[in-house]
């Protein structure tokens, strides 16, 4: 690292603006200092760096080149922090190409892919992506005009853009996998608890692993690395709309009836 630059404890590389901010918010809410960067070279002292590559809709080769270029400005390869590749939970984008480029740039030989986001209805079952109980190839995401999803099998999608071996794995297998040759493992997850176990296994691994996932895995890392509990939020919401005032007047003139259900 250059003199005067503090190495982050977590580095997130997202492929779009929304994903970058999602990841940053999750980690900021539990006490991390977070910087979201959109241009290189970037230098900062936050504990979490979130880099937006804005490469989701790019040609795969150009997306890989963008990742390589971004990482060349971040001197982390010799001793990388926890590195998260933030992807879309519905598998849109250049997942395989960007995973390979990031692994090479960070000197990491293993990647764990867990794109599930249970809170949004996105789960991984038997290596396939499901959305609200429907296989993703049977949803509107299959016909996305920019980045259509061609298969429900996550490993198949990744293999379209990389020659690195990719296959389903389990959390228990992570501690036994070889680090001599590059590999990519896809892990099932249907609940936040599943993602918590995946995040814990990656963060405790004997050698650095690339953690690949959506907002769900970023939330799991936030829970695992929390510096302080999320703050209580009070929202006070008002409206200057004339329609709101009219509705309030109607409500004030409308009789209110109370029924004691204990007598029913």
What do the predicted segments below correspond to?
Residues 2-9, 34-37, 47, 63, ...:
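Cap/lid and interdomain-hinge subdomains that line or gate substrate/regulatory clefts
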Residues 11-13, 48-52, 112-114, 184-188, ...:
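Structural motif
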Residues 19-23, 94-95, 195, 220:
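Short glycine/serine/threonine-rich phosphate/pyrophosphate-binding segments
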Residues 24-32, 40:
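Residues that scaffold, gate, or flank divalent-cation-dependent active/transport sites
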Residues 31, 206-208:
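Soluble secreted/lumenal catalytic domains
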Residues 41-43, 118-122, 217-220, 242-243:
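Short gly/pro/ser/thr-enriched loop/turn and capping motifs at secondary-structure boundaries
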Residues 50-67:
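Short, structured active-site "lid" loops
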Residues 209-256, 260-264:
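Acidic, glycine-rich loop-and-beta core segments that form the ion-binding/anion-interacting portion
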């Amino acid at each position: 690292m250059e003199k005067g630059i503090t190495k982050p404890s977590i580095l997130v590389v997202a492929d779009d603006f929304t994903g970058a901010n999602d990841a940053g918010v999750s980690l900021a809410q539990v006490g991390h200092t977070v910087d979201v960067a959109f241009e290189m070279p970037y230098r900062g002292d936050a504990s979490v760096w979130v880099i937006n590559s804005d490469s989701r809709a790019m040609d795969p080769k150009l997306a890989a080149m963008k990742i390589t270029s971004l990482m060349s400005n971040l001197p982390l390869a010799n001793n990388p922090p926890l590195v998260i590749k933030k992807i879309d939970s519905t598998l849109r984008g250049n997942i395989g190409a960007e995973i390979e480029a990031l692994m090479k740039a960070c000197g990491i030989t293993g990647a764990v892919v867990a794109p599930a986001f249970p809170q949004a209805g996105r789960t991984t079952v038997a290596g396939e992506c499901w959305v609200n109980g429907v296989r993703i190839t049977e949803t509107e995401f299959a016909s996305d005009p920019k980045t259509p999803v061609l298969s429900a099998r996550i490993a198949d999608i990744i293999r379209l853009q990389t020659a690195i071996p990719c296959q389903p794995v389990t959390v228990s297998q992570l501690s036994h996998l070889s680090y001599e040759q590059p590999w990519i493992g896809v892990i099932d997850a249907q609940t936040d608890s599943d993602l918590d176990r995946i995040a814990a296994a990656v963060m405790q691994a004997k050698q650095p692993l690339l953690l690949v996932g959506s907002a769900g895995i970023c939330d799991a890392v936030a829970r695992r690395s929390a510096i302080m509990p999320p703050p209580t939020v009070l929202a006070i919401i008002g409206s200057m709309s004339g329609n709101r005032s009219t509705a309030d007047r109607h409500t004030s003139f409308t009789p209110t009836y109370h029924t004691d259900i204990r007598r029913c």
